[in-house]
């Protein structure tokens, strides 16, 4: 958490500042990856009001420095919705100095300082987890996670990687999102199970409804079969009773009374 010496009234507000670093994203994938993570997170944190996930939004850490706009970042311990409405930028002195605990950078064909200047800046700010996703890599891991330890970034190995301070894991998996069949980033729980996407949740609920309908139909069929079986048994009993009665009548005609035997 950063502290500012200047009185807050003297510092510019979000309305006074540009919404981003004014540098356009140079890959559609950058936004799609972050969008998917945010959409999944909305389901994981449903009902919570103490988190915010920004995408390509300007993060202002000093009134004397330009904003930096990560492809995605997560802050826990801030209001999900500001009283004045939607955030146009993330201004640290308006967020009680809460630094994003998680920052994501997606590498495109042209490097933008993900391994140098940005990494150093996030380290100096105190961002706990710095995640670099480099899908164009072939020989090295496409997902790198760094954890801040004694003011230095230390790589964390694994897939997924659990981040206990924020209660989430980050990892990668093959998936078809918006008709794009490829590797995507996902959130994971502590057991290493991947959280479902909104589309998967809808499909799962649909399957549950269909299974419930099938079970109800099967129960109805079993009940109907039981009724039919009971009816057949009763008919057989009735027929047996008629046969027994006819047999008894025939014996009486022959002078034989079964009751006297």
Predicted regions and their residues:
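C-terminal interaction segment
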Residues: 2-22, 43, 57-64, 70, ...
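Short acidic/polar active-site loop segments enriched in Thr and Asp
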Residues: 128
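Acidic-basic catalytic patches of nuclease active cores, encompassing PD-(D/E)XK
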Residues: 27-55, 61-69, 73
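Short beta-strand and adjacent tight-turn residues that come in two discontinuous sequence segments
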Residues: 132
């Amino acid at each position: 958490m950063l502290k500012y010496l200047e009185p807050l009234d003297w510092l510019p507000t979000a309305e006074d500042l540009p919404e981003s670093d004014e540098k356009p994203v140079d890959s559609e994938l950058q936004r799609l990856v972050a969008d998917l993570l945010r959409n999944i997170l909305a389901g994981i944190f449903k009902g919570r009001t103490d988190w915010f996930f920004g995408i390509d939004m300007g993060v202002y850490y000093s009134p004397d420095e330009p904003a930096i706009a990560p492809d995605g970042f997560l802050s826990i311990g801030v209001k999900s919705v500001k009283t004045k409405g939607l955030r146009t930028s993330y201004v640290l002195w308006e967020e009680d100095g809460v630094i994003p605990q998680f920052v994501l950078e997606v590498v495109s064909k042209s490097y933008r300082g993900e391994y140098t200047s940005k990494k150093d800046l996030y380290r100096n700010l105190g961002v706990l987890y710095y995640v670099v996703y480099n899908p164009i890599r072939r020989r090295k891991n496409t997902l790198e996670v760094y954890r801040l330890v004694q003011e230095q970034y230390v790589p964390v190995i694994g897939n997924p990687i659990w981040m206990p301070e924020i209660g989430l894991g980050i990892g990668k998996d093959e998936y078809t999102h918006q008709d794009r069949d490829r590797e995507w980033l996902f959130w994971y729980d502590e057991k290493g199970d991947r959280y479902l996407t909104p589309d998967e949740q809808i499909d799962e609920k649909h399957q549950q409804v269909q299974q419930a309908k099938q079970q109800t139909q099967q129960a109805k069929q079993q009940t109907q079969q039981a009724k039919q079986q009971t009816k057949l048994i009763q008919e057989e009993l009735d027929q047996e009773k008629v046969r027994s009665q006819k047999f008894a009548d025939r014996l009486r005609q022959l002078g034989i009374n079964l009751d006297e035997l």
